[in-house]
Swiss-Prot record:
GO terms under cellular component: cytoplasm
Record flagged with keyword Disulfide bond: no
Name of the molecule in the record: Regulatory protein RecX
Entry's localization field: Cytoplasm
Gene name for this UniProt entry: recX
Database matches in Pfam families: RecX_HTH2, RecX_HTH3
Entries under HAMAP family matching the protein: RecX (MF_01114)
Amino acid sequence: MAAEGKSLKARAAELLSRREYTRQELVRRLAPFADSEDELNAALDELAASNWQSDDRFARQFASSKGTKFGSRRLAQEMRQRGVDSDTIREALSGQDDLASAREQWRKKFGRLPADAAEKARQYRFLAQRGFPADVIRQVLAGGADDDFYED
């Protein structure tokens, strides 16, 4: 294979040219090609120092790209799984408007208030699976104060 001779830094740059990765994701992807853990950490430290890789940038980009479709709880969980620390997650999600996102997702999927308890449960589950907090879901399903939002 022609790619066997590439350095760790070149492999990482190739990955990072496509999308942002967290340090943990890069460790997982590059570990099979590293001779030692120290070599891998040195290469990743160099990438972070030259600002090629940044967990902060990943978190902001991730929150921005997925924020309209998912709630802050799901976004935070996915970022934690990818190795982003809690402070970075909190900062990236600080501008997240769960209510507006939940309303938009609800409007796309359902568009009208539930007629019975079974339909309400179905709509509640839909929003909960997308990581929206319970108080936000209750606001969306109650109709809230936004009268022109609920059109027939």
